[in-house]
Amino acid sequence: VYFINTFPLTMKTTLTSSRLTLTLASLKDLAFIHELQSYHQSAEFNTLAVPENEEVTRKSVSSWEECHAKEAIEQYHFKISEGENPVGLIGLNLGAARYRRGEVWYTIHPSQWKKGIATEALNLVLDLGFDHLKLHRIQAGCAVGNLGSIKVLEKVGMIKEGRGRQILPLSTGWSDNYEYSILESDPRK
């Protein structure tokens, strides 16, 4: 039997590195989250596209808060901050406990691209998944044209497993997707 998401509440809410702090996103972060999701550069490879208005974002973030309030969290939505400045979002969605797997996603503010933030935040979430949640596998997908995300996923040690044809409904049309994963036994970088 695996108890993959039952560690103390304080460990669930904050992840830190020497530069970044990841905290569970909430409605108090609404203005930043809406701004971040409204950038067309950020939404280019996002299947959710740009939210119509702040109320759409509010509903999403409210559902995140509901997920975070559960005793056993199944979906983590973290705000990434550098110092006091929010710079992005990263999430970990857990699958059925029997499979011990999760899927990660992230969005970084365009002004913060190419600064190693996504890589550093992803490493923190991988540590959470493998070291604390005792996952066996963490996966991620990205559009084949999303060269920045491809570099991030490979930099943290994820392995490209395959290509899904026309699986992502992007604002520009259907896109192929690369599927990546890392196992608990794989080297992490």
Regions found by a protein language model. Give the residues of each.
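A short helix-loop-beta-strand connector motif used in the catalytic cores of GNAT acetyltransferases and
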Residues: W64-K79
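Conserved GNAT-fold acetyl-CoA-binding loop/helix
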Residues: Q41-S63
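Secondary-structure boundary/capping residues
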Residues: S42, P51, K70-I73, I138
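Short helix-to-loop capping/linker segments positioned immediately adjacent to catalytic or ligand/cofactor-binding
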Residues: F45, C67-A69, K114
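Acyl-donor (CoA/ACP) binding surface of acyl/acetyltransferases
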Residues: Y2-A43, H77-K189
